[in-house]
């Protein structure tokens, strides 16, 4: 793939995602959930996310993490008074308690934990529009995860969750981009990067 601007790539990937039929997305979400048993997470902390729109994943995936014995933390996204994204805060996932939030997201109710709490996670599932084989991740562009992931433990598995066709050969990267260690796709499962 020849490098394109991040903006052009985001637009193309979002258009492609929106064209995927709901039944296909549901099947892919179920496949993603099936790969979780390969993670050794009982008694450990997993930072995950609540998918919105056409993002890969599901609430059932979060429930499976709990069933596997993990402490599951979900992000809380906020901007400062000037509209600049702040590092993500974290809230404990409890089934049936998610509330509507800014940016069309769903999140756990307070109390919330500080951004540095991500450092307790052994596994971090990160939403992405795409990831490449070197671990470069393309998000939606707000920078919430880039402002937060530098708090992750060096030993954490940082896993971008994408559709199979969103694992690319190359993505334009910038110095502030935090590399993923793994990718999770419906067909490939969990694959080490870099």
UniProtKB/Swiss-Prot annotation:
GO biological process: folic acid-containing compound biosynthetic process; tetrahydrofolate interconversion
Substrates-to-products reaction catalysed: (6S)-5-formyl-5,6,7,8-tetrahydrofolate + ATP = (6R)-5,10-methenyltetrahydrofolate + ADP + phosphate
Annotated InterPro entries: FTHF_cligase (IPR002698), FTHF_cligase-like_sf (IPR024185), NagB/RpiA_transferase-like (IPR037171)
EC number: 6.3.3.2
Disruption of the gene: reported phenotype: Cells lacking this gene lead to an accumulation of 5-CHO-THF. This mutant becomes more susceptible to antifolates that inhibit folate biosynthesis (sulfonamides) or reduction (trimethoprim).
Binding site for ATP: 6-10, 139-146, 177
Function: Involved in the removal of 5-formyltetrahydrofolate. In vitro, it is a potent inhibitor of various folate-dependent enzymes in the C1 metabolism network and in vivo it might function as a folate storage. 5-formyltetrahydrofolate is also used as an antifolate rescue agent in cancer chemotherapy. Catalyzes the irreversible ATP-dependent transformation of 5-formyltetrahydrofolate (5-CHO-THF) to form 5,10-methenyltetrahydrofolate (5,10-CH=THF). The reverse reaction is catalyzed by the serine hydroxymethyltransferase GlyA (SHMT).
Record's protein name: 5-formyltetrahydrofolate cyclo-ligase
